Structure formats: C-alpha cells, structure tokens
Amino acid sequence: MKITLLSTAYPYRGGIAVFTERLARAFQQEGDKVNISTFSLQYPNFLFPGKSQYASSERPSDLDITAEVNSINPFNWFRIGRKIKKQKPDILILKYWIPFMAPCLGTISRIVKRNKHTKVIVVVDNIIPHEKRFGDNFLSKYFVNSVDGFVAMSKSVYDDLILFDAKKCILGVHPLYDNF
C-alpha cells in the first residue's frame, strides 16, 4: 500500500513526532511505501508554550520526511492538498490533537479526497481539548466532516468523538513505545 502520514515528525520533537515516526516504521516493516509530510511551521513561536519545538537529534535516515505544511497559511494548505491528491496514496493518515489544526488538516483532507481514491483516516489524541476555548467545537466539527474514519487512542477520546460522529470511529488504545 502507498501511505502518506501528515503529522508532526522530525525536525519536531515530542510524543506526537515519536508516534508518527514509529507508525511509519511499522508500515514499512509490513512492506508498505510510506512518506511523512510534516510541518514547516507547526505553531507560531508565540503560541508554543515550551522551550523549543525542535528535536536536537539527528534526522532519521530510514524515513522519507518532508517538512512542508504551514499550519497557518491557507495558500500552503491548497498546495499541499493538491500535491497529495495528485500522488494518490491509498491512505492518508492524519494525527489530530488540537482544534487549532482543524482548518489546515480539514482543508487538506477535503482536497485530497477529491481524487476519489485516497481514504483519510485520523489518529486522534484529543477531539475536545483539556483547555477549552471559544470555537473549539466548530473547528473540530469542520475537521470531523472532512475525513473517512477515526482511531481514538483512549476510551475517553472515543467517548468524545462519538458525540461528533459515532459511525466513523473505532477504539485503538495507545500502544506502548519500544524506542526507549
């Protein structure tokens, strides 16, 4: 199968990047052709609460990672959407963890699905954020309506997801990491 992952990955650090890279390797071990499309800009610096968004480690040599998605530039979303649409992966796997990403990921998903071939599946860490903000439900609803299915990483997220769309969701409990 031809699989595109659109998620946080190197040069970014953190649990989502580790998960994405590990998932890509698992698909590769099964014989699938995998590429990762990650962010050229994930968050503007003033929105990032930590010390640094970036990894201090070496670039993974066994993964095809392209930093190209700008989370706040709609022109970029259309360009990336058209690019992935043209590549026609069998599956586009998105990672969703915060409604801030809904306009970007939802727009890209809608464009890709126009190729009538690619299925868009989302691995969800949170659909309703811990720190709720005005507009979160609207943004998440926009995103939910753009994809074919969800894998919730916990029972509580599954319960939140079925409030948006019970038909598209399965529970796949978060795996233990084997990279430590």
Name every feature range the model reports, one short phrase each.
Residues 7-22, 97-102, 131:
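A short, glycine/small-residue-rich beta-strand->loop->alpha-helix junction that serves as a flexible
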Residues 1-4:
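Extreme N-terminal starter segment of soluble prokaryotic enzymes
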Residues 145-180:
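Donor nucleotide-sugar binding/catalytic pocket of nucleotide-sugar-dependent glycosyltransferases
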Residues 116-121, 127-146, 155, 178:
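Nucleotide-sugar donor phosphate/pyrophosphate-binding loop at the beta->alpha transition
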Residues 88-90:
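Proline-aspartate-enriched helix->loop->beta-strand connector
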Residues 74-80, 92-116:
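An aromatic- and histidine-rich active-site surface loop
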Residues 7-13, 25-86, 157, 162:
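N-terminal strand-loop element at the rim of the active site
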